[in-house]
């Protein structure tokens, strides 16, 4: 079965298609998945041919043996084409319904199933007059087969853009009056009409039944959404219970498709009499690629009775090929599948596709791709037919399940990535700083990076194994084989060393089947090993009895499991894409090892990156200024608070609404001073969440007003909370972007309580009246006001009476995909079921194709007796100014995120060159140096330590809140001065500025206690800024240092040091000084640095002043440092 694809992939992985480095892995993975699918199509086609041949020859179909042979034969292209044609254009349907295909333009029948005449009572005997019998033939006008009202419905459906959204259409046979569900879809030659007999003759009951099915699905969806996050198993267990409750099948399972295309039953709900299938693994060809493609096109598939004889389709001889039945609900199962079902005792089945978002690489035309994650399958031990409305409700449930599953998988992926990243960092640190054996003997070890049975480090000819691994002699043989056949690659991965071509694979046995290896250097390797798959696979089903001689030949879940174990014999579990990404990421060590043998040649690159970062910050500042201008002039109410909830931003619009000026609002408490009591709890929760980074959207709050009419009115605003963050991503407040909905709120209250002249209000052209539509208890549209007509382009007469879900929003007003329709259906049913929905994001295309983005509020609708009779829905459209403000905000957030990524990248990547500098310094220290050279080396080392500490403590929050840990060490003050001066020498030369040093000679040998690196950082930053703004050329900057000794006690002496950094002229720009001393939100990048240095100095009990005189300006830095006895003697 899938062994063909798997064997080929493993062989390629081992024989030369070596895995790429992490930078290109995702693209390789995508291409690899395509090649797997193509290979499986070949295996599927071969298996199908063997089955067909066995039927023609009268021989039995040996299932397990056929799976083995598919891996050993080449399939001609014609055979694959014939196989796909058989699957998609099989020419037969199931007999529980009938099918008619029609030319779309003329309504002329072009194909029909042989049972259509009987099912529609169209036989000649049933016709009163034989002059013109209404017998169904090719060329018949399909409208003549049904009642006039049914024909009108068909004509209307044929004119719809999205015909499937109108399904099912309730129609009646003209001769017998029998009702049918007509399920329509377009194909290449016309429209296919699947006709399924309905159980009642009252269309109203049909609609009520469909709505009831939807309500059951919504209840199940609500249950799914209420589950705690982070548990995919619980989600799958819940969905099988829900589907079994909805449909009544004896067994419901969740099948999951693995990356190598094989499947696994991960959840199951069944009646007690049935054998469990939970944990069953089966080969990929059990569900062929062609079938998987069909599941993506037609997401619900029902087989009513696998024993039933399929009905042939008769078609117009002028058609070029058999009619396509891909989208037909009646398509007959393939004989191979029907036999499989019969063998396992499953007479009827219902299969629901589980679709999630695919990889970015699979996206086409900018649209996100969809991936078939698995299937939810129901089995029944007797024939069973589920009516279309209930199947449609199950499809909605699957869409919600797919959404929920997608979120859970993304969360699990993020947690896994964080774990891998943490492990990678620790492993890299061990290899660079400690003995290489640390990654094996310490925790975490390389076994924690990916799932494996053993791992090893082969370094400088020594072997460090962990877990289940080859012997040292075997590993040396593997290394020799790698260098001989794969010496020019960066690594290798395979799930079968035997298939990869390693001659000694047989000697390793089942203990070591799969291997992944990363080349650290040409002599150093990291290995991961996996044992054979069967060790990992367990099936919860009963084992077959030894006397069941034909067990392997018959198609049955047990034989599938046996076949799967045969396929994966001598194989490990495949290495998943994410695991290979984690392994490849360690290849960064190759560069680190090389850097340790060289110098800081990469420093220039990082300097260029630094310039790019600063340029990006300038652009971000520009965006921020534009954002401030928009906020101040916006016609939408916008206000902001600090971390204590006090107003620090209040634009003109919110001032106008509340009659509270900017000056009066600043500093007031949002919750206690400005919000009505009834909204205080909502505002507190909103603020609390936003300060934790959870940004709530579309929340309604009621604001107080402060004008003369304060007792007679209130202001209602719907706001989005946006966490305000500083440069280091720390939350420093919350900004609220709102929309005034006061007028709409008043109208809404009147509607809900049915006050005043209802129709006059609804259809008023007053711009305060929002777009409104209403639903009856069956989700049919009962109201569509003037504003709604204007918004959508659809008149009231065209809309009233149609189904809101699918017919109006779906066909008339197109939605973006089935997920949007599922969410809308849930909102509508919740409102009818007494659960109101407020400010739900709702988007659709109007009649002219314009995309409308809005907020939807759905409330229950009651009559005078208080009984719920439907739902009222209000649509709010964001103002252009608000939309522009949100666009700018998103742009700012995107830019900020980009800068944070660059900063994180810089902090990570700059460590390797620093290690190179450190290593080079250590080599130089061991050589014979002059005194001057030793001083240069000491200065270089001091600068390196300063850079390392800045990178290591990049979290500025510790500096802001005073929790930064300062080190205490003894050092020469002269060394600090040398290191500080060295950092400005290039800038001095570039700007032709002279440096004057007024420093007493005894400072050079003065020893003090303190955090040398932080003192060095602070002085260097102040000096650098003074040099940057000194007059140029022919300017000067002077450093003055005046030490004074203070005797604190007999044993403690403190040196009181005053540093002066002086330059002539105007000095620093005013905004820089403002950033340094006063601003909580910096404007300039230099100002941020100065502000942080001032706070670091404050932590050391120091002080900084900036003094501007008539002809010069200077920094005055005051710092007290404890002295050693030796230091005090040198000063004395």
Curated annotation (Swiss-Prot):
UniProt keyword terms in alphabetical order: Chromophore, Photoreceptor protein, Receptor, Repeat, Sensory transduction, Transcription, Transcription regulation
Segments of skewed composition (Low complexity): 12-26
Keyword Phosphoprotein belongs to the record: no
Superkingdom: Eukaryota
Binding site for phytochromobilin: 336
Record-level GO BP terms: detection of visible light; red, far-red light phototransduction; regulation of DNA-templated transcription
Bias-annotated ranges (Basic residues): 1-11
Entry GO MF terms: phosphorelay sensor kinase activity; photoreceptor activity; protein homodimerization activity
Region named Disordered: 1-27
Pfam families noted in UniProt: GAF, HATPase_c, HisKA, PAS, PAS_2, PHY
Positions of the GAF domain: 231-409
Residue ranges annotated for the Histidine kinase domain, each copy included: 905-1125
Protein's job: Regulatory photoreceptor which exists in two forms that are reversibly interconvertible by light: the Pr form that absorbs maximally in the red region of the spectrum and the Pfr form that absorbs maximally in the far-red region. Photoconversion of Pr to Pfr induces an array of morphogenic responses, whereas reconversion of Pfr to Pr cancels the induction of those responses. Pfr controls the expression of a number of nuclear genes including those encoding the small subunit of ribulose-bisphosphate carboxylase, chlorophyll A/B binding protein, protochlorophyllide reductase, rRNA, etc.
Family statement drawn from the similarity comment of this UniProt entry: Belongs to the phytochrome family.
Subunit-structure text: Homodimer.
Protein name: Phytochrome B
């Amino acid at each position: 079965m899938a062994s063909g694809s798997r064997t080929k992939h493993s062989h390629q992985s081992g024989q030369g298609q070596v895995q790429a480095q992490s930078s290109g892995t995702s693209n390789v993975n995508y291409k690899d998945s395509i090649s797997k699918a193509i290979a499986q199509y070949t295996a599927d086609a071969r298996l199908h041919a063997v089955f067909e041949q066995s039927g023609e020859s009268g021989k039995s179909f040996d299932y397990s043996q056929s799976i083995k042979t598919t891996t050993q034969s080449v399939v001609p292209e014609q055979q694959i084409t014939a196989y796909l044609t058989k699957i998609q254009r099989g020419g037969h349907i199931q007999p529980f319904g009938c099918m008619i295909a029609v030319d779309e333009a003329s309504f002329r029948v072009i194909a029909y199933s042989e049972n259509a005449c009987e099912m529609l009572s169209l036989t000649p005997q049933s016709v009163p007059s034989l002059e013109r019998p209404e017998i169904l033939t090719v060329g018949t006008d399909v409208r003549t087969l049904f009642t006039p009202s049914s024909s009108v419905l068909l004509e209307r459906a044929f004119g719809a853009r999205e015909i499937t959204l109108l399904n099912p259409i309730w129609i009646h046979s003209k001769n017998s009056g029998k009702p049918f569900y007509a399920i329509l879809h377009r194909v290449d030659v016309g429209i296919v009409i699947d006709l399924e007999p309905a159980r009642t003759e009252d269309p109203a009951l049909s609609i009520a039944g469909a709505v009831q099915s939807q309500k059951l699905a919504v209840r199940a969806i609500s249950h799914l959404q209420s589950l705690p996050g982070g548990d995919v198993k619980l989600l799958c267990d819940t969905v099988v219970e829900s589907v079994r409750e909805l449909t009544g099948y004896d067994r419901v399972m969740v099948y999951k498709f693995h990356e190598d295309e094989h499947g696994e039953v991960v959840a199951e709900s069944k009646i007690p009499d049935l054998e469990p299938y939970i944990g069953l693994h089966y080969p990929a060809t059990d569900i062929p690629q062609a079938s998987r493609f069909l599941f993506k096109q037609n997401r619900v598939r029902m087989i009513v009775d696998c024993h039933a004889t399929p009905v042939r389709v008769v078609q117009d001889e002028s058609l070029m090929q058999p009619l396509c039945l891909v989208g037909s609900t009646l398509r007959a199962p393939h004989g191979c599948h029907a036999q499989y079902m019969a063998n396992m005792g499953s007479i009827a089945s219902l299969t629901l596709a589980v679709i999630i978002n695919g990889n970015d690489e699979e996206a086409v035309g900018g649209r996100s791709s969809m991936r078939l994650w698995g299937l939810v399958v129901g089995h029944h031990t007797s024939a069973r037919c589920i009516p279309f409305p209930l199947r449609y409700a199950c499809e909605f449930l699957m869409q919600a399940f797919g959404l929920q599953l997608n979120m859970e998988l993304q969360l699990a992926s993020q947690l896994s990535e964080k774990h891998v990243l943490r492990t990678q960092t620790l492993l890299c640190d061990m290899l660079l700083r400690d003995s290489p054996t640390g990654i094996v003997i310490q925790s975490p070890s390389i076994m924690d990076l990916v799932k494996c049975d053993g791992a090893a480090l082969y370094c400088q000819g020594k072997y460090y194994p962990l877990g289940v691994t080859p012997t040292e002699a075997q590993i040396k043989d593997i290394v020799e084989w790698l260098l001989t056949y794969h010496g020019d690659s960066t690594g290798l991965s395979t799930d079968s060393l035997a298939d990869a071509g390693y001659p000694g694979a047989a000697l390793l046995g089942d203990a070591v089947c799969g291997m992944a290896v990363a080349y650290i250097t040409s002599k150093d390797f990291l290995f991961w090993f996996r044992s054979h798959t069967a060790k990992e696979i367990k099936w919860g089903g009963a084992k077959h009895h030894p006397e069941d001689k034909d067990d392997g030949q018959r198609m049955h879940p047990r034989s599938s499991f046996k076949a799967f174990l045969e396929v994966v014999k001598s194989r490990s579990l495949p290495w998943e894409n994410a695991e290979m990404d984690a392994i490849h990421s360690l290849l960064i060590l190759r560069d680190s090892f090389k850097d340790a043998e060289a110098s800081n040649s990469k420093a220039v690159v990082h300097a260029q990156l630094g310039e790019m970062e600063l340029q990006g910050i300038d652009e971000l500042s520009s965006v921020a200024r534009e954002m401030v201008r928009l906020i101040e002039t916006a016609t939408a109410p916008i206000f902001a608070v600090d971390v204590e909830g006090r107003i620090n931003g209040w634009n003109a619009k919110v001032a106008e609404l509340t009659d509270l000026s900017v000056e009066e609002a600043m500093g007031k408490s949002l919750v206690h001073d400005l919000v009505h009591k009834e909204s205080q709890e909502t505002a507190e929760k909103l603020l609390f969440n936003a300060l934790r980074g959870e940004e709530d959207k579309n929340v309604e709050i009621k604001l107080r007003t402060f004008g003369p009419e304060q007792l007679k009115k209130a202001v209602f605003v719907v706001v989005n909370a946006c966490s305000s963050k500083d440069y280091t991503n720390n939350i420093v407040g919350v900004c609220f972007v709102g929309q005034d909905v006061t007028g709409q709120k008043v109208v809404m209250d009147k509607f809900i309580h049915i006050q005043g002249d209802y129709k006059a209000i609804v259809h008023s052209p007053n711009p305060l009246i929002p777009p409104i539509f209403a639903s009856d208890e069956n989700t049919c549209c009962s109201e569509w006001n003037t504003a709604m007509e204007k918004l959508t382009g659809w008149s009231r007469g065209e809309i009233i009476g149609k189904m809101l879900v699918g017919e109006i929003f779906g066909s008339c007003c197109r939605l973006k995909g089935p997920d949007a329709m599922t969410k809308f259906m849930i909102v509508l049913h919740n409102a009818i079921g007494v659960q109101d929905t407020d400010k739900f994001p709702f988007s659709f295309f109007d009649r002219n194709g314009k995309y409308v983005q809005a907020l939807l509020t759905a409330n229950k609708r009651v009559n005078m007796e208080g009984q719920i009779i439907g739902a009222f829905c209000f649509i709010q459209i964001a103002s252009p100014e608000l939309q522009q403000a949100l666009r700018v905000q998103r742009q700012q957030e995107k830019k900020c995120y980009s800068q944070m990524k660059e900063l994180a990248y810089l902090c990570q990547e700059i460590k390797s060159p620093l290690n190179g500098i450190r290593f080079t310094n250590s080599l130089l220290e061991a050589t014979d140096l002059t005194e001057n050279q030793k001083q240069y080396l000491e200065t270089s080392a001091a600068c390196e330590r300063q850079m390392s500490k800045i990178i290591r403590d990049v979290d500025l929050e510790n500096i802001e809140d005073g929790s930064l840990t300062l080190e205490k060490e003894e050092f020469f003050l002269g060394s600090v001065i040398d290191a500080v001066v060295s950092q400005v020498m290039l800038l001095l030369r570039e700007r032709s500025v002279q440096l004057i040093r007024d420093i007493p000679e005894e400072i050079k040998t003065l020893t003090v206690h303190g955090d040398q690196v932080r003192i060095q950082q602070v002085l260097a930053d102040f000096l650098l800024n003074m040099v940057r703004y000194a007059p140029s050329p022919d300017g000067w900057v002077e450093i003055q240092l005046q030490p004074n000794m203070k005797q604190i006690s007999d044993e403690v002496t403190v040196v009181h040091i005053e540093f002066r950094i002086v330059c002539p002229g105007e000095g620093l720009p005013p905004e820089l000084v403002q950033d340094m001393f006063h601003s909580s939100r910096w404007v300039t990048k230099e100002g941020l640095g100065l502000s942080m240095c001032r706070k670091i100095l404050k932590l050391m009990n120091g002080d900084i002043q900036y003094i501007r005189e008539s002809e010069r300006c200077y920094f005055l830095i005051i710092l007290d440092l404890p002295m050693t006895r030796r230091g005090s003697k040198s000063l004395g």
